[in-house]
């Protein structure tokens, strides 16, 4: 699992937006749960703002999460966590969440941090 790289997403990762959204939708259907829909533009913007975490196995998408702040940056949440099913059970979600926490602390050092499932 260490060969999978987890890092802050940027404009180079926009090509993964449709895959990310498809993976989230498939996971929700399998679980039979509703999930907040995110538009391609929203996910793309998170990448351009460097407020997203992506995990890649070479050039293959493995996982994703993003951060969102509110109340004048007093609060920050990580949300939209998804790990491709073939990569589950190996601690990848933990690595993505850890990177999201580090990014949150870097970007919003005084904020209270939450994890949200929507």
Q: Language-model features: where?
A:
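A conserved beta-strand-loop-helix scaffold within acyl/acetyltransferase catalytic domains
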Residues: 25, 31-83
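Short amphipathic alpha-helix that is part of the acyltransferase structural core
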Residues: 1-38
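Conserved beta-strand-loop-alpha-helix junction that forms the acyl-donor binding cleft
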Residues: 113-118
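Conserved acetyl-CoA-binding loop-helix of GNAT-fold acetyltransferases
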Residues: 83, 89-104
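A structural signal for short coil/turn segments at secondary-structure junctions
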Residues: 107-108
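A structural micro-motif
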Residues: 2-4, 50, 111
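Alpha-helical elements of Rossmann-like donor-binding domains used by nucleotide-donor carbohydrate transfer enzymes
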Residues: 19-23, 42, 95, 99
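Short strand-loop junctions, especially beta-strand C-caps/beta-turns
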Residues: 7-9, 81, 86
């Amino acid at each position: 699992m260490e060969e999978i790289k987890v890092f802050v997403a940027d404009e180079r990762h926009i090509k993964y937006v449709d895959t990310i959204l498809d993976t989230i939708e498939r996971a929700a259907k399998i679980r039979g749960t509703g999930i907040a829909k995110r538009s391609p533009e929203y996910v793309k913007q998170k990448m351009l703002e460097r407020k997203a975490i992506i995990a890649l196995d070479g050039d293959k998408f493995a996982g994703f999460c993003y951060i969102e702040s509110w109340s004048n940056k007093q609060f920050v949440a990580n949300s939209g966590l998804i790990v491709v099913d073939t990569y589950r059970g190996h601690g990848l979600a933990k690595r993505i969440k850890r990177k999201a926490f580090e990014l949150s602390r870097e970007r919003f050092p005084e904020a209270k941090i939450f994890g949200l499932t929507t």
